UniProtKB/Swiss-Prot annotation:
Protein name: Large ribosomal subunit protein uL5
Any one cellular-component term (Gene Ontology): ribonucleoprotein complex
Taxonomic lineage of the native organism: Archaea, Methanobacteriati, Methanobacteriota, Stenosarchaea group, Methanomicrobia
SUPFAM superfamilies linked: RL5-like
Family label: Belongs to the universal ribosomal protein uL5 family.
Length: 169
């Protein structure tokens, strides 16, 4: 594009592992996620009590990491390689975000199967925006992003096709 303010960019990549229970299983998942991403892991907590799954409100049931900048770009390249650079059109939302899953953590380089730990899957969410989005998030003189500048599903799909050579089905 000719206008640099219209070029989409990856704002952040959020990697989430939903374990569904606290305890040693969650600690193992945190260790795996920290090894794969190289960053400190944050726990995610249950929003409500679910007796069918024996989950209480406020109980830690998952872990996540937010990656930005070069770390996000590198991790995204690796993750897209694992899913064979194929995404479904339904994985893109109207705001320009993309979510996809990796079924086994052992697909990442340097990770091997450990029978004591098992296999964990993870959800990867990519937030795509344009330069100038800070206007809507800053504390002072906050403004809305005009509709013409907002990123759409089609913009994100073309961005992923051009930059990452992703096949969208």
């Amino acid at each position: 594009m000719s206008n640099p303010m219209r070029n989409p960019k990856v704002e952040k990549v959020v990697v989430h592992m939903g374990v569904g229970e606290s305890g040693q299983h969650l600690v193992d998942a945190e260790g795996i996620l920290e090894t794969i991403t190289g960053q400190t892991v944050v726990r995610s907590y249950a929003k409500r009590t679910l007796p069918a799954f024996t989950i209480k409100k406020g109980e830690p049931i998952g872990c996540k990491v937010t990656l930005r900048g070069e770390a996000a770009e590198g991790f995204l390249e690796t993750s897209l390689g694992i899913v064979e650079k194929r995404l479904n059109e339904s994985q893109f939302d109207i705001f320009g975000n993309v979510s996809f899953g990796v079924e086994e953590h052992t697909d990442y380089p340097g990770m091997r199967y450990d029978p004591n730990i098992g296999i964990f899957g993870m959800d990867i969410t990519v937030v795509v925006n344009r330069p100038g989005y800070r206007v809507s998030k800053r504390r002072i003189a906050k403004r809305k992003i005009p509709t013409s500048h907002k990123i759409t599903k089609e913009d994100t799909i073309s961005f992923f096709k051009d930059k990452y050579a992703v096949e969208v089905e």
